[in-house]
């Protein structure tokens, strides 16, 4: 890693060093190298996802947000960054910020997007709308979640539960 002390113009050598450290289970040593990769190449999704996995494992929601925020600019088509940033805000009980991130993520959805992730976006949005007492929007979000994945257990459970609590559309809740 002594070569990494020199200013790099290409992220390839740093990424190679990081991959070597990761294969040797030297995550702590790989972390600053992965940050160096992102300084050189902020669009490097594998490096950012690896750092993100470390932050998630440590349950460091501030770091998750810090890693995801620039990713939304550099790689706006990678839905995982919206997902984890939205979840981090949700865990920090920042409902408005979480909802904003998920809305931006939904705007990036294409025919090629992972339908499970898209369904989860909408399911979580349903939960967030419910927290904000915006039930019409919550039910619309749950409906959208089920369009993308009809057996999304989280969406089905919360949708049915909230309908039963409100005593509305009980036949729909039973479905």
Regions found by a protein language model. Name each.
Residues 1-175:
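Alpha-solenoid helical repeat scaffolds
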